[in-house]
Amino acid sequence: MGLEAFSRSAPLTLGVELELQLVNTNDYDLAPYADDMLRLMKKTPLPGSVVPEMTNSMIEISTGICHSCSEVLGQLTPIRDALVKSADKLNIAVLGGGTHPFQQWHERRIYDKPRFRELSELYGYLSKQFTIFGQHVHIGCPDANAALLMLHRMSRYIPHFIALSASSPYVQGQDTAFDSARLNSVFAFPLSGRAPLALTWEDFGAYFDKMTRTGVVRSMKDFYWDIRPKPEFGTIEIRVFDTPLTIERAAALAGYVQSLGAWFLADQPFMPAEDDYLVYTYNRFQACRFGLEAVYVDPAAGGHMPLRQHILATMDEMASHAAAQGASSALHLLRTEVEAGQNDARWLRERQREEQLLAEVCRQAAQRFRGLAL
């Protein structure tokens, strides 16, 4: 099957997907209630969609096409409210976060869907270990070549996305010392990491054809890249975000992506090059391990600086573009937390230090997802 044509989409439009945890309200471990939630959610007309995910203790929600991060929040809010209402009927809870803090992967069950069964047969235990929870942000691009240019420009900012969204410090009851341990599970898949540097759709199509001829790849879904083109939507899809603990942060992260995209389209600030990727894996590791306390290596100049400093400087650089997109409040929310060194991973660790019980941390995270201030 050849690479499909890149569809038209309005530049800088947004779409957001959130993978969410379903937990019981007894000990707050994961609960296999995806089918029941989907059945109840069908009764409420909502924007976007609600679908199953790899294992039956997960659910994915998504917005429709949005023109601003406030519209993203406007669509996520009724979906969240309907989820909470449905969960209450089932005596379960819904929460964000990139990993469940203490679930045991071997207890998971693959959701009964052909693609999930196929992936389970191919990847074995990795499929159950893939009970992790991410936010994906789609951004509309003017055309196929512009999409590839946008993709490789966004790649310099992967550490920003990781540190700002990091919410997975705990795995199987242990503090991993990572702010985003979730991405360590993605590394195990053979077609993860970065996309190849192709800046025209023709060159990308040639790469895709080579990969399909090997029999390794059948469609774009087989690539688990950090950012990948989504030709049927006319977007690129950024996939490194942990699912935040609140929909407000999820919408703000979408606003951050949109502001970057607006800056790229208006100012063309740099041309991507293969050498950008010399420090890609190192920067990615730093952000996963240390979050906002990471070191960032500038791919162009080679200089080292605190990642937090690079994020704040980037916010200053694109402030006028954020304002034009209606994303100033999103950047303000994120800036305040960056200046305080606060992300969701830190919040989870602070709660655990105080409570000394990860089940109680999950209970409080579920309250935060409901919209209650904690």
UniProtKB/Swiss-Prot annotation:
Gene Ontology terms describing biological process: modified amino acid biosynthetic process
Annotated InterPro entries: GCL_type2/YbdK_subfam, GCS2, Gln_synth/guanido_kin_cat_dom, YbdK
Pfam families: GCS2 (PF04107)
Keywords attached to this entry: ATP-binding, Ligase, Nucleotide-binding
Its EC number(s): 6.3.2.2
Catalyses which reaction(s): L-cysteine + L-glutamate + ATP = gamma-L-glutamyl-L-cysteine + ADP + phosphate + H(+)
First-level EC class: ligase
Keyword Ligase listed: yes
Gene Ontology MF, one: ATP binding
Domain of life: Bacteria
Family, as annotated: Belongs to the glutamate--cysteine ligase type 2 family. YbdK subfamily.
Role noted for this protein: ATP-dependent carboxylate-amine ligase which exhibits weak glutamate--cysteine ligase activity.
Protein name per Swiss-Prot or TrEMBL: Putative glutamate--cysteine ligase 2
Organism: Verminephrobacter eiseniae (strain EF01-2)
